[in-house]
């Protein structure tokens, strides 16, 4: 046997065993995996897997030399184990020319990338998605000669969006220029995205913006699309001359020139990561309609300027540094990825009109603006070394956005809202096991895209807030400043920088290790529960703090209070300690412990029974407001979730929240409303749990509404308005008679003179729905002209009308809508928009009636016995029946859903009120 054959066999055998081992653990990576145009589909059995792998490896072994076998085997291993590109090839500079064919929704690209190769190779891998590559040329200058090599083969790894370019010769270490010619698409999954808008004179126009997803740039040009890789960019954009397009970029626009049929724009950037690039193209005559920040006249312009000035002052930046190009674009698919010196808002997210929008919208818009502006601090600053580290930058931007809005607009109480709306929601989602840990592996495209979800924007800032309060303001701010001066950074870099600042400014004998403290908080799906035990004697009280798991280090800095006075110095309950014990002198007054001051720690607190009773007694005293408002909210949220997880008896939860009848602050009420949402699934059922829940909650809502009133006044505090809206919503959901009477009164008042007695927009749906529930007002009275149905713009209004409990009125409107629908089809064929609007509202109406009345005997009877006459033709019989079943909670009513004839017959049987079997019979 000659040496070449022996090497082939050895390589073949070892590679086969190696790939088979990987196959068992990484099957999904082989889906549609392409090498040299050979397709490997996902096998179904072990034998099939072995045969197909054998086939591909035999081909590699039979057609390659020793070096190329080794090269290909390395390539396979990299693809299986690591989604990253090889680290021995790096881009230094990109020169890109893009020519848009806007009528055909395509663009042509030429990309010249200056790269450095540090290790001999025969192929180059880079990212590319939805691009049709037509030519690849690699050049290298050696002395006076330019060596040119064309790619002999191009392979795609679709799951990783990687293109592999194979060359005839081995590429030695050195500097190269990689030139690629390609074609892309202007579409939602393309390099450019088209967004429609209506300009000032009513014309429909198109705005074109670069794909705003984290990995959207690989759809615009082939590139090394990893966050830790930075390069300079020179981008030339050619747009049709006759389209009057204007180009804005997040970088320096050197100049533009016109040479029919194109207008050319030249853009350069400093060293940045690919995901920070942004380009917006639109008709220059519609500049103000696209809402650039300098032309905004609504409140948001002032807010953005105020937020920007505050951030610049806090971070000691030159005035005007952050107030650059900021655009609010209607319909923009915004995933929250920040661009360099370029803020793209989704206009719907930040528009606020005080005449039609509830105050909660203004607060939420403020939060988004704050995060976007602070995100600009990371323009040319530190980039994460890998996608899994992106949560750090996003968490910092979100948290400091909250801090900035809280400082700029203190009346928004943005920090208080952050705790109850963001941090507590994060704890709830952790309970549900629906969030991955912050520090998660990223091995696929879907995992990269999923990173930019609510996990980053609720858990990341919550964990960083805990670190902030553990190390203190000065250390936290200085540590972040130092970290941002780095070019790229990993989590270890961040912990190292923060530790360095902490050590230099802290004199404590028992210093904390920042990395050890924080690692488990970002690596685990859940959070710890801190158990608090008090042991009393005649003069002293012993306090024992412990966690169920020994793995957690729980920061308790400034978190332990007795009688609202801090009793413990800075310390952590470390993983080495089973418990922490301290003692305090008994006072004559009521004693109670508050752990986790202002809920700065990301954990729940479980007190023993006597401690719960002491806290409850104090909350039910006239001094309840002495407990910090965030701790009042924390106690409610903790007790509810301990109760539903069977760690606490529910009667304790109701004892704790019994004080709410005196509480007029929206913040502690917020977790109570969230608890009501969680328990709402039991409301349709007529059982003991449902009755107790309704009774207990109404016992708090009744006195509250008597205290704050049912009517909204213009001079009411923002949070009183929010509290009243939620309190009345839940009071009516729970069938409170006073709530329904007030709604009927407001509805009749409005209908007496709709022009003069106008309802506030955010009360309109509530008033109509709850007013119609109890009034004798007929729906025919509301629609004297049924053509008005086609002019209803918001589906929510159809939902409100479906609240009517008058059986005759509902049936009458159904009949008239059915007739009018047929009239529309025959009479309005030229007015398609009007007809479509009517049919759409009719469909909404049908579904909303089912949702509201499927459990009502009389209306359910009408639905079932007039099914074909009532059902819109656009809804299938199957879909309609399933919808009725989904909203029917009575076994008796379900049994009545027995026979509906369309093209098929449906026989539905209910077994033990739990199992539903549907037989389809022709």
Descriptions of predicted regions:
Residues 73-86, 172, 179-234, 285, ...:
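Glycine/proline-rich low-complexity spacer/linker segments in large multi-domain proteins
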Residues 405, 423-424, 454, 459-460, ...:
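Long, ordered, helix-rich scaffold segments
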Residues 114-132, 236-240, 543-555:
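Surface-exposed beta-strand/loop patches in extracellular or lumenal glycoproteins
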Residues 2-110, 202-207, 515:
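N-terminal, polar/Ser/Thr-rich
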Residues 109, 212-215, 222-370, 399, ...:
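Hydrophobic helix-coil surface modules that form long, contiguous segments used
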Residues 131-200, 274, 580-587:
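A surface-exposed beta-strand-loop module
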Residues 132-139, 510-515, 520, 525-596:
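Beta-strand-rich binding/interaction modules
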Residues 133, 266, 299-548, 678, ...:
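Hydrophobic alpha-helical and helix-loop surface patches within well-folded domains
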């Amino acid at each position: 046997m000659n040496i070449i054959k022996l090497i082939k066999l050895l390589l073949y055998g070892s590679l086969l065993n190696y790939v088979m081992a990987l196959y068992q653990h990484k099957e999904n990576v082989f889906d549609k995996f392409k090498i040299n145009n050979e397709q490997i589909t996902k096998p179904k059995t072990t034998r099939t897997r072995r045969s197909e792998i054998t086939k591909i490896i035999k081909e590699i072994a039979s057609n390659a030399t020793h070096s190329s076998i080794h090269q290909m085997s390395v390539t396979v291993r990299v693809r299986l184990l690591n989604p990253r590109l090889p680290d021995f090839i790096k881009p230094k500079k990109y020169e890109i020319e893009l020519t848009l064919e806007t009528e055909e929704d395509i663009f042509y690209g030429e990309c010249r990338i200056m790269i450095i190769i540090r290790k001999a190779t025969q192929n180059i891998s880079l990212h590319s998605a939805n691009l049709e590559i037509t030519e690849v040329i690699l050049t290298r200058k050696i002395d006076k000669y330019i060596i040119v090599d064309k790619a002999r083969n191009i392979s795609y790894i679709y799951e990783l969006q990687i293109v592999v370019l194979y060359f005839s010769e081995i590429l030695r270490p050195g500097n190269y220029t990689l030139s690629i010619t390609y074609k892309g698409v202007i579409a939602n999954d393309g390099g450019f995205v088209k967004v429609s808008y209506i300009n000032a004179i009513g014309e429909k126009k198109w705005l074109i913006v670069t794909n705003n997803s984290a990995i959207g740039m690989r759809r615009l040009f082939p590139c090394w699309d990893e966050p830790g890789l930075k390069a300079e960019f020179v981008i030339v954009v050619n747009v049709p001359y006759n389209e009057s397009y204007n180009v804005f970029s997040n970088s320096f626009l050197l100049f533009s020139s016109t040479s029919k049929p194109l207008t050319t724009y030249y853009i350069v950037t400093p060293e940045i990561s690919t995901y920070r690039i942004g380009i917006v193209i639109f008709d220059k005559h519609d500049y103000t309609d696209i809402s650039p920040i300098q032309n905004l006249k609504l409140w948001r312009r002032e807010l953005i300027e105020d937020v920007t000035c505050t951030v610049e002052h806090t971070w000691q930046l030159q005035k005007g540094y952050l107030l650059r190009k900021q655009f609010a674009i209607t319909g923009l698919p915004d995933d929250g990825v920040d661009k360099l010196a370029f803020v793209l808002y989704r206009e719907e997210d930040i528009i606020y009109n005080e005449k039609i929008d509830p105050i909660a919208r203004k607060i939420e818009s403020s939060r988004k603006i704050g995060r976007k502006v602070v995100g600009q601090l990371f323009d040319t600053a530190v980039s994460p070394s890998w996608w899994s580290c992106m949560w750090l930058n996003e968490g910092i931007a979100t948290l400091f956005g909250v801090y900035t809005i809280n400082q700029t607009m203190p009346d928004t109480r943005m920090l208080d809202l952050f705790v109850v709306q963001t941090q507590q929601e994060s704890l709830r989602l952790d309970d549900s096991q629906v969030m991955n840990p912050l520090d998660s592996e990223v091995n696929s495209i879907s995992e990269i895209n999923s990173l930019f979800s609510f996990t980053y924007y609720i858990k990341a800032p919550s964990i960083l807030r805990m670190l902030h309060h553990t190390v203190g303001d000065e250390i936290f701010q200085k540590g972040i400043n130092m970290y941002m001066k780095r070019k790229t950074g990993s989590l270890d870099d961040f912990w190292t920088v923060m530790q360095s600042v902490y050590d230099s400014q802290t004199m404590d004998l028992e210093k904390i290790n920042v990395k050890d403290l924080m690692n488990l908080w970002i690596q685990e799906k859940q959070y710890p529960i801190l158990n608090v035990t008090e042991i009393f004697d005649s003069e002293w009280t012993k306090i024992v703090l412990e966690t169920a798991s020994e793995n957690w280090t729980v920061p308790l800095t400034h978190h332990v209070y007795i009688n609202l006075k801090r009793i413990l110095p800075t310390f952590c309950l470390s993983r080495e300690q089973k418990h922490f014990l301290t003692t305090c002198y008994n006072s004559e007054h009521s004693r109670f412990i508050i752990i986790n001051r202002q809920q700065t720690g990301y954990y729940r607190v479980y007190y023993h029974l006597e401690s719960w009773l002491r806290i409850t007694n104090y909350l039910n005293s006239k001094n309840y407001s002495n407990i910090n408002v965030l701790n009042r909210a924390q106690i409610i949220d903790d007790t509810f979730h301990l109760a539903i997880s069977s760690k606490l008896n529910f009667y304790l939860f109701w004892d704790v929240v019994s004080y709410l009848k005196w509480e007029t602050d929206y913040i502690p009420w917020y977790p109570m409303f969230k608890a009501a949402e969680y328990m709402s699934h039991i409301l349709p059922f007529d059982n003991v749990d449902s009755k107790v829940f309704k009774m207990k909650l109404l016992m708090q809502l009744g006195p509250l509404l008597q205290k704050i009133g049912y009517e909204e006044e213009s001079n009411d505090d923002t949070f009183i308005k929010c509290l009243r809206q939620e309190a009345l919503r839940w009071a009516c959901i729970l069938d409170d008679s006073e709530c329904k009477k007030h709604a009927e009164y407001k509805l009749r008042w409005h209908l007496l003179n709709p022009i003069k007695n106008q309802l506030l927009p955010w009360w309109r749906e509530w008033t109509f729905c709850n007013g119609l529930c109890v009034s004798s007002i007929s729906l025919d009275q509301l629609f004297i002209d049924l053509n008005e149905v086609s002019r209803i713009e918001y589906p929510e209004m159809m939902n409100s009308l479906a609240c009517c409990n008058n059986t005759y009125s509902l049936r009458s409107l159904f009949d008239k809508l059915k007739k009018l629908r047929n009239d529309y089809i025959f009479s309005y064929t030229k007015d398609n928009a009007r007809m479509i609007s009517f049919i759409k509202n009719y469909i909404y109406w049908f579904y909303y009636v089912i949702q509201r009345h499927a459990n009502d005997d009389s209306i359910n009877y009408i639905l079932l016995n007039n099914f074909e006459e009532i059902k819109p033709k656009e809804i299938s019989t199957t879909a309609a029946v399933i919808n009725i079943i989904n909203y029917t909670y009575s076994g008796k009513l379900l049994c009545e859903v027995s026979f509906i004839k369309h093209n098929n017959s449906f026989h539905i049987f209910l077994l033990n009120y739990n199992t539903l079997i549907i037989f389809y019979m022709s």
